[in-house]
């Protein structure tokens, strides 16, 4: 028998120490990685619940195990809520991650050797959209689209390539593109060439849920997403679809790609979806967008170039070449100042992928901890202060002290 008062620190002091150190890092560092956020205590509690013990292969009301009557309730709530958020006909909440969701779509509609079209990773796409080292790039013939001279999606070139190559699947979505995507235009092209149209909205899902970024659901055959990032739920994936695709997608997830779903995570997804339906969530997302625009404007004023010239979302790419520093160096030195960021290639980047000429910045996490206009501007100036003098130890120490003063005023978990 287990006693509920047995704590991690008693069972495994080494893991406890690592968790405590990470807790401290999250509290005392400013999180600027666009794909990271802070889940609510309720979301985290669900993931630590006894639902982790339950096997539930299949779907609500159609399981291969007994004793699923209660986890059925949790999964059905998650399905109903995510459909309500995005206006979808049908939903699958079982994917373990965004990559699994994308792979399930490939399994449902494609055969090895089929042609797919996605945004080039080098110009803002995602590795699961056709990168050579990813399964999507190994199994399928990949045609990529990218940016024009204004660093905006080159819709004309995309349309021309689609008509030339007749892809079986067209993917819209990105991991490092700051502007609004014209999903309706993609849908028209896909219809013209007879392609399935899939949108990966993982980065933008929270903004879409709040109605402040274009919703792809009315236009796409299939929409995939993660449930963390801007949506602020547990780490996991979802697939939204037209009603006619529900059976084939569900079969692709189980038994095609996965076995037992993670019921504790699905319960956490349901909680996150309930949070996303609240008026407070819309206010939060509006501030995420406003903070991003303030950060972009402030960095521009401090002599840095924002790729595409602006942001219309939660994320931006920053070109560092004017400062004579690489993305790899910037990531390290900003980390020393207790601001967490990730190096990222910029369009036509002359540096290697593990070095890069840019960094990616996002505002979901800082906004979750309560940063508003003033704090967003302060954060951007602190980033610029570091990049102006990246090798000055006294400068880094001074910035770090300002970061700690700021984070102490805005704890993540009060």
Curated annotation (Swiss-Prot):
Pathway: One-carbon metabolism; tetrahydrofolate interconversion; Amino-acid biosynthesis; glycine biosynthesis; glycine from L-serine: step 1/1. The keyword Nucleus does not apply. Its main location: cytoplasm. Pfam families: SHMT. The keyword Amino-acid biosynthesis applies. GO terms for biological process: glycine biosynthetic process from serine; tetrahydrofolate interconversion. It is found in: Cytoplasm. Its cofactor is pyridoxal 5'-phosphate. Its EC number is 2.1.2.1. Keywords: Amino-acid biosynthesis, Cytoplasm, One-carbon metabolism, Pyridoxal phosphate, Transferase. CDD domains: SHMT. It catalyses: (6R)-5,10-methylene-5,6,7,8-tetrahydrofolate + glycine + H2O = (6S)-5,6,7,8-tetrahydrofolate + L-serine. It comes from the Bacteria. GO terms for molecular function: glycine hydroxymethyltransferase activity; pyridoxal phosphate binding. Catalyzes the reversible interconversion of serine and glycine with tetrahydrofolate (THF) serving as the one-carbon carrier. This reaction serves as the major source of one-carbon groups required for the biosynthesis of purines, thymidylate, methionine, and other important biomolecules. Also exhibits THF-independent aldolase activity toward beta-hydroxyamino acids, producing glycine and aldehydes, via a retro-aldol mechanism. Belongs to the SHMT family. This is Serine hydroxymethyltransferase. The lineage of its organism: Bacteria, Pseudomonadati, Pseudomonadota, Betaproteobacteria, Burkholderiales. The gene is glyA.
């Amino acid at each position: 028998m287990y006693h509920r008062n047995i704590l991690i620190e008693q069972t495994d002091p080494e893991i406890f120490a690592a968790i405590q150190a990470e807790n401290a890092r999250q509290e005392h560092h400013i999180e600027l990685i666009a794909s990271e956020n802070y889940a609510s205590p309720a979301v985290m509690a669900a993931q630590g619940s006894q639902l982790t013990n339950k096997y539930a292969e299949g779907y609500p009301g159609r399981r291969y195990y007994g004793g699923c009557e209660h986890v059925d309730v949790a999964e059905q709530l998650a399905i109903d809520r995510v459909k309500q958020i995005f206006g979808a006909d049908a939903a699958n909440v079982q994917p373990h991650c965004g990559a699994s969701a994308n792979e399930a779509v490939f399994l449902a509609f494609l055969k090895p050797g089929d042609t797919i079209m996605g945004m080039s990773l080098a110009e803002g796409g995602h590795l699961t959209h056709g990168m050579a080292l990813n399964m999507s790039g190994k199994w399928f013939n990949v045609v990529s689209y990218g940016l024009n001279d204004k660093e905006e999606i080159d819709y004309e070139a995309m349309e021309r390539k689609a008509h030339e190559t007749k892809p079986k699947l067209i993917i819209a979505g990105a991991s490092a593109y700051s502007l609004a995507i014209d999903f309706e235009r993609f849908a028209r092209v896909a219809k013209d060439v007879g392609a399935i149209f899939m949108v990966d909205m993982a980065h933008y899902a929270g903004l879409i849920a709040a109605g402040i970024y274009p919703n792809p659901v009315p236009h796409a055959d299939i929409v995939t997403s993660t449930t963390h990032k801007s949506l602020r739920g547990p780490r996991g994936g979802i697939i939204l679809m037209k009603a006619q695709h529900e059976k084939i997608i569900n079969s692709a997830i189980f038994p095609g790609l996965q076995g037992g779903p993670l019921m504790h995570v699905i319960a956490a997804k349901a909680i996150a979806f309930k949070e996303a339906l609240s008026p407070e969530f819309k206010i939060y997302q509006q501030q995420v967008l406003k903070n991003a625009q303030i950060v972009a404007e402030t960095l521009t004023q401090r002599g840095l170039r924002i790729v595409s010239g602006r942001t219309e979302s939660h994320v931006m790419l920053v070109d560092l070449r004017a400062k004579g520093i690489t993305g790899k160096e910037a990531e390290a030195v900003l980390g020393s100042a207790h601001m967490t960021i990730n190096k990222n290639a910029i369009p036509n980047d002359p540096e290697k992928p593990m070095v890069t000429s840019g960094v990616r910045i996002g505002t979901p996490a800082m906004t979750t901890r309560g940063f508003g206009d003033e704090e967003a501007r302060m954060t951007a100036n602190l980033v610029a202060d570091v990049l102006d003098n990246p090798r000055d130890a006294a400068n880094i120490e001074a910035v770090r002290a300002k970061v700690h003063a700021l984070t102490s005023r805005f704890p993540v978990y009060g």
